Amino acid sequence: MTLKIGIVGAGGRMGRQLIQAVYHTEGVELGAAFERVGSSLVGTDAGELAGVGKLGIKVSDNLTQEKDNFDLLVDFTRPEGTLQHLAFCVEHHKNIVIGTTGFDDQSKQAIQQAAQNIAIVFASNYSVGVNLVFKLLKKAAKVMGDYCDIEIIEAHHRHKVDAPSGTALSMGEHIAKTLGRDLKTHGVFSREGITGERKPDEIGFSTIRAADVVGEHTVWFADIGERVEISHKASSRMTFANGAVRAAKWLSTKQEGLFDMTDVLDLNNL
């Protein structure tokens, strides 16, 4: 049975890539596409918007009107919008794939609570490569983390609105958890002026915003005399879109629960 996917933020950079990914993936089809109320894109053909040709699906600004046209929602928008879409999914018992970043703790709790009623994949990054890097970081932290300086450097395009990136924070959380540290206590997100010497248990973050960088992350495990770097560079948003569609197909068989790409890719068994 073909899975019908609804995509919110269809006119954005990721939204268009998601439509393309759905179009080129077997076993799924675009059921609905959404934009915010007042958008000039409402009423346009979603396929033409994404460059895959006419699909006969008009961009809508009303999830309720289209609720019978899709089985599952994919959301890469902003936290305030995603929480509204999440409430809709709970009300109408539709699963959701969330790629939005920048949530505060209260919003994350709302997602956890919603997962008692529907199935959710919530990940900071849907790239297969990045999620493999998460696994490698935990292994490196076990071997080197207690005696190395750990620094996370991330770069994204000038339009990204949150910093550090959700992926960088996830990297820090994986490392901190492996080392028995609390990232809220040990994470250092800004250095300026006379900061004093670096504390040995810090996990540092550096952020770059420039031009059209899709996404780059590098983690340093730096010791005196040597440094190990683990890096991932994305050259196209299609890697994230394809991963999100893969997650949607995997999620379609689930009833409730909160999952991430580790579950989708079965990385715990590596």
Curated annotation (Swiss-Prot):
- GO biological process terms on file: diaminopimelate biosynthetic process; lysine biosynthetic process via diaminopimelate
What single Pfam family name could you report for this chain, choosing any that match?
DapB_C
| Superkingdom of this protein's organism | Bacteria
Q: What is its EC number?
A: 1.17.1.8
Copy the pathway line from the protein's UniProt record.
Answer: Amino-acid biosynthesis; L-lysine biosynthesis via DAP pathway; (S)-tetrahydrodipicolinate from L-aspartate: step 4/4
Give the UniProt subcellular location, in the record's own words: Cytoplasm
Q: Where does NAD(+) bind?
A: G9, A10, G11, G12, R13, M14, E35, G99, T100, T101, A123, S124, N125, Y126
Q: Which GO terms describe its molecular function?
A: 4-hydroxy-tetrahydrodipicolinate reductase; NAD binding; NADP binding; oxidoreductase activity, acting on CH or CH2 groups, NAD or NADP as acceptor
Main subcellular localisation: cytoplasm
Active site, per annotation: H156 (proton donor/acceptor), K160 (proton donor)
Keyword annotations from UniProtKB, A to Z: Amino-acid biosynthesis, Cytoplasm, Diaminopimelate biosynthesis, Lysine biosynthesis, NAD, NADP, Oxidoreductase
Q: Which GO terms describe its cellular component?
A: cytosol
Record-listed NADP(+) binding positions: R36
Catalyzed chemical reaction(s)? (S)-2,3,4,5-tetrahydrodipicolinate + NAD(+) + H2O = (2S,4S)-4-hydroxy-2,3,4,5-tetrahydrodipicolinate + NADH + H(+); (S)-2,3,4,5-tetrahydrodipicolinate + NADP(+) + H2O = (2S,4S)-4-hydroxy-2,3,4,5-tetrahydrodipicolinate + NADPH + H(+)
Matching InterPro entries: DapB_C (IPR022663), DapB_N (IPR000846), DapB_N_CS (IPR022664), DHDPR_bac (IPR023940), NAD(P)-bd_dom_sf (IPR036291)
Translocase keyword on record: no
What positions does the entry give for (S)-2,3,4,5-tetrahydrodipicolinate binding?
A: H157, G166, T167
What is the similarity comment for this entry? Belongs to the DapB family.
Q: Which HAMAP family match?
A: DapB (MF_00102)
Provide the function of this protein: Catalyzes the conversion of 4-hydroxy-tetrahydrodipicolinate (HTPA) to tetrahydrodipicolinate.
Name it.
Answer: 4-hydroxy-tetrahydrodipicolinate reductase
Q: What is the gene called?
A: dapB
